[in-house]
Amino acid sequence: LYPGLTVAILFAAEFFMLAQAIRYTSASHTVVLLYTAPIFVALGLHWKLPSERLSKIQWSGILIAFVGIVTTFIGRENLLEQGLSQVLWGDLLALLAGIMWALTTISLRLSKLNEAHPTQTLFYQLLGGFVFLFPLAFLLGQAEIHWTYIAIGSLVFHTLIMSFMSLMLWFWLLRNYLAS
């Protein structure tokens, strides 16, 4: 139960931070910073699993990735237009969402959930997301839904493709391949 609760909380925290990040910074910043998760997974598992030790070339790759991320954010004029502190807050939230995703992945790899069927892990994450995020939507005044055909289609797509199929594939990959 503890590993399931851990991944549920981390999953909910990731999506909460992601949703908040988009309120303060651009979607492009959010996506780039969210997808730092594999870097943090490689770093985290390097210290926890002997089979995931990073080689010198992999360390070089991580350094290049970090330098690339920093380089893409340097010298952007739109930061001043949007308000630097607001954008930086959103960027921090997006980076924290990436770290939460990485911690979720690391928790999956290090716990008994690594041996569980992917549907069980998916259940923990989606149930946890619902239990923690549903009340937060009301507390933050973000619970109003404007039902349109596009909204319904998007909900169906994200439920079936993004939440089910892609996460099932992700869990299968985690069980069958090293993160590094």
Question: Where do the PLM segments sit?
Answer:
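Membrane-interfacial segments
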Residues: 52-53, 57, 76-83, 109-115, ...
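Cytoplasmic-side transmembrane-helix entry/capping segments in multi-pass membrane proteins
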Residues: 2-6, 53-67, 115-125
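Hydrophobic/aromatic residues within transmembrane alpha-helices
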Residues: 21, 47-50, 54, 111, ...
